[in-house]
Amino acid sequence: MQIFVKTLTGKTITLEVEPSDTIENVKAKIQDKEGIPPDQQRLIFAGKQLEDGRTLSDYNIQKESTLHLVLRLRGGIIEPSLRQLAQKYNCDKMICRKCYARLHPRAVNCRKKKCGHTNNLRPKKKVK
C-alpha cells in the first residue's frame, strides 16, 4: 500500500509499505529517500507519536494515510557568551515595588499607569 510522509518543510514523500511493517522499517525507508537517520525522526499520526516496535496496522494506518515527520530536538550546552547574554536579558531587571512590573535595568520610573509611574523600584532578585 502507499502512504505519504509530510515533512516540516512541506515536502511530501511517497512510500510503498505493508500494514505489517514496523515503524522502524518506515523510518529506514525515509532514511533511504531523505538521508535522515532514524534516531532523529519522529513520526506523528492522528496526533500521536508512533513507537518504533509497533506496526502500521496497530495505529490503523491505511492506504494513502499521511504521517507527519518531525525531527527530534537535541539538547546541549549553551556557549558561555550566549549564556551571559541570556542571563543579562532575563535576570538584569528592575521590579516596581507597587505593581511588580518587570522593567529594563536602567529604569527610573515604572511604565505602568496603575501604580502612578512610581519611582519606587528594586533590582530583580538573583536566582541562587
Swiss-Prot record:
Ubl conjugation listed as a keyword: yes
Domain of life: Eukaryota
Gene3D superfamilies: 4.10.1060.50, Phosphatidylinositol 3-kinase Catalytic Subunit, Chain A, domain 1
(Microbial infection) ADP-ribosylthreonine modifications at: T66
Cross-link (Glycyl lysine isopeptide (Gly-Lys) (interchain with K-? in acceptor proteins)): G76
Cross-link (Glycyl lysine isopeptide (Lys-Gly) (interchain with G-Cter in ubiquitin)): K6, K11, K27, K29, K33, K48, K63
Other remarks in the entry: Ubiquitin is encoded by 4 different genes. UBA52 and RPS27A genes code for a single copy of ubiquitin fused to the ribosomal proteins eL40 and eS31, respectively. UBB and UBC genes code for a polyubiquitin precursor with exact head to tail repeats, the number of repeats differ between species and strains.
The name this protein goes by in its record: Ubiquitin-ribosomal protein eL40 fusion protein
UniProt lineage: Eukaryota, Metazoa, Chordata, Craniata, Vertebrata
Gene responsible for this protein: UBA52
